[in-house]
Amino acid sequence: MLQLPDGRGRPSPHTEEMQITEIYKSLQGESTYAGMPCVFVRLTGCNLRCTWCDTEYSFYGGKKMTPEQVFDEVQHLRAVSGLIEITGGEPMLQERELVPLMQRMVDSGYRVLLETSGERPLDRVPPGVIKVVDVKCPDSGEGDTFHIENLETLQPHDEIKFVISGRSDYEFARDFAVRHDLARRVNAILFSPAFRKGASGARDASNCLIDPQELAAVFHADH
C-alpha cells in the first residue's frame, strides 16, 4: 500500500507485504454477527474521507506484514466462533495480497467478513467471503462513490449497511434499497445511526447524530 500525502491509499505495485494497522480479538459490534467473538484485521489506508469516520487512525502508519504473518496472527488469536472481520480503512486497496489471503482463511474453515465501502470493484472477492458493504449516504460527504457494478457481485449471504445521520440520508438509503431490490439480493439491509466525530466514551444515544428512536419511527412509518 502506498500512502499519498493526505493519507489516502492507492493500489501499490506488486509486493509480498501488506500494511496493517492492527489485529485484535473482541466482540463483533455490527452487522447480523453482533455479539459474536471475532478476530479483527484492520488494514491501513483509505481513499474516502467520511465526515463521521471513527477510524481515522487507520489512514496512516501501520506496520508491514506478509500475508503469511497475518494468517499466523489470526490463527494465534483464533476466536471460538471462527469469525474474522477484514476492515479498514478500505481493505480492497490492498486487493492483490488480500484476495488470496481471504481465500486461504475460508479454505481453513474460518467465516470471513469483508467490510468495504464498495467504492472499488468486488468481483475478485472469493465467493465464500461475506461482504458487508457500507454504501455511503450523502451526509457522509462520499455519497457518489459506490461502484454500482458491485451490485452484480452480491450474494444471498452478503449484507448492505447504511450509516444514517439525518432524514435525507434515510431517504437516500430507502430509495437505494428499493430501486436496486436489495431485499432480494442480500441477507440483511442494516440502517445504523451515525455517531458524532470525535465523540468520547461509549456509543450511546447521546452521541448519535440522529436519535435512534426518531430513525426507528421514520422507518416504521414507511413500512
PLM regions with names:
Residues 29-33, 45, 221:
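Short secondary-structure boundary/capping segments within folded domains
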Residues 31-34, 51-54, 202:
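Short, glycine/acidic-enriched capping/hinge loops at junctions between secondary-structure elements
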Residues 2, 14-25, 37-38, 44, ...:
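Conserved Radical SAM active-site core
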Residues 21-24, 42, 161, 190-192:
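Residues in well-ordered beta-strands of folded domains
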Residues 93-223:
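Conserved AdoMet/S-adenosylmethionine-binding subsite of the radical SAM
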Residues 28, 32, 58-59, 152:
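N-terminal/domain-start segments enriched in small and hydrophobic, helix-friendly residues
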